[in-house]
Amino acid sequence: MGRYKLNANASVTIGTWGNTTPTGIWYNKERNKISEFQNNNNTVYKTASISTSKLSKINSTINSSDTWGLLNNCTHFAIRVWNSAGDTQISSCTTPAQLRNKIINTGSYSTGTTNAAFRNAPNSVKKH
């Protein structure tokens, strides 16, 4: 995924961070900061099988997104990745809470961070 070597049947978390040095894409940082999140029950996610062509689109989006700014934050990154391969598009929003609501509105979502794939992502944190 992106520039991270992901083994078969493995998981990774990918996000942009503005409160780190350097800023930009980090792998598995969310996984490692799970105990610091204020309310993990507010976390929403969807899982899906994807084709090779969709994976290529996702990788291209990740590889061209190693930046962070107020108008290019983690929410914008998540929307770009979602829209690069999703059948359902999400319109622009500026906060994680707004994005959460848009994901909920797409239907068939899950909540929390007890998902085994999320919990089993490697502990290592790697900058893009």
Can you describe what each PLM-predicted range is?
Residues 29, 33, 53-57, 98:
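Exposed alpha-helical structural elements
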